[in-house]
């Protein structure tokens, strides 16, 4: 059976049998969730999962090594967490993650002028990830790709369901996804960004929750796919809530991040949460129902 009964007709246990793919992942030095891919039978290539990227990306030498050709005269505007730019497109005959195949995918080709490409060869963005419900297990160190229509039609025992909101990126058709954090009775939209190795916050959010940040203890740099940014302050949030879940001691870095402007959040309290926010909790992103499933603590 794909599911195990859990005592209620409408509540089922999400187990490995329903996953289309279970693949090991590693955590990069910047907190990225990295899996191995094959491009046109070339690889393995190290790609990071990134729900903050609307389009998948290949870096630097990967197109040349994989025999990819840039599409003449075609460019795409890529919005990163820190910067934006226009970059050429390439078409991949087949991109494989484990046994899951994506054919004729269009990827942006970015130069390797950031520190990020020294650790990864590319990014799997929402254009690939939204074809599935995506599960990440910190304890098992695996990524699970589930059939999206099956997961969206179920509720699961032992998982909390958190609503996600779709935020339009610029004037295009791409979207980012956010959840609401509650800190000191203030609701703060937080972009769910698997490509963010750290939790981030703008100054307006720090002021709204009336917690005094301290100057950055180090000259830490946040490395983005397009540009980099230096952390100017950091904030330890001792208590916060996400729906009916409560969390303690989450570190947020503060700087100027372009993505807040792109999402029309530059004049509002806003944050970004990456995989580090969940620590040892497993989670599943259900794009169809716009919800985040978080495994209950033990």
Short names for language-model regions:
Residues 1-298:
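Pepsin/retropepsin-fold aspartyl endopeptidases
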């Amino acid at each position: 059976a794909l599911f195990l009964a859990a005592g209620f007709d409408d509540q089922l246990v999400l187990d490995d049998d329903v996953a289309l793919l279970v693949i090991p992942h590693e955590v990069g030095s910047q907190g990225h969730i990295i899996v191995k891919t094959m491009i046109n039978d070339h690889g393995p290539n190290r790609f990071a999962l990134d729900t903050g990227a609307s389009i998948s990306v290949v870096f630097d030498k990967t197109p040349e090594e994989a025999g990819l050709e840039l599409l003449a005269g075609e460019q795409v505007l890529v919005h990163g967490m820190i910067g934006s730019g226009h970059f050429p497109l390439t078409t991949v005959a087949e991109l494989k993650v484990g046994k899951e195949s994506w054919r004729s995918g269009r990827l942006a080709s970015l130069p390797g002028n950031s520190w990020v490409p020294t650790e990864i060869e590319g990014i799997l963005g929402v254009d690939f990830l939204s074809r599935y419900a995506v599960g990440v297990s910190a304890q098992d160190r695996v990524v699970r790709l589930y059939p999206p229509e099956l997961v969206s039609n179920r509720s699961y025992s032992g998982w909390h369901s958190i609503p996600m909101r779709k935020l339009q990126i610029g004037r295009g058709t791409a979207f980012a996804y956010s959840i609401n954090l509650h800190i000191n009775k203030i609701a703060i939209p937080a972009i769910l960004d698997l490509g963010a190795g750290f939790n981030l916050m703008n100054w307006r959010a720090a002021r709204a929750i009336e917690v005094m940040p301290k100057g950055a203890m180090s000259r830490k740099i946040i490395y983005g796919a397009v540009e980099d940014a230096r952390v100017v302050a950091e904030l330890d949030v001792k208590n916060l809530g996400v729906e009916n879940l409560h969390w303690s001691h989450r570190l947020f870095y503060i700087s100027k991040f372009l993505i807040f402007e792109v999402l029309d959040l530059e004049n509002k309290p806003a944050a970004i949460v990456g995989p580090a926010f969940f620590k040892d909790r497993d989670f599943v992103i259900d794009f169809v129902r716009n919800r985040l499933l978080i495994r209950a603590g033990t």
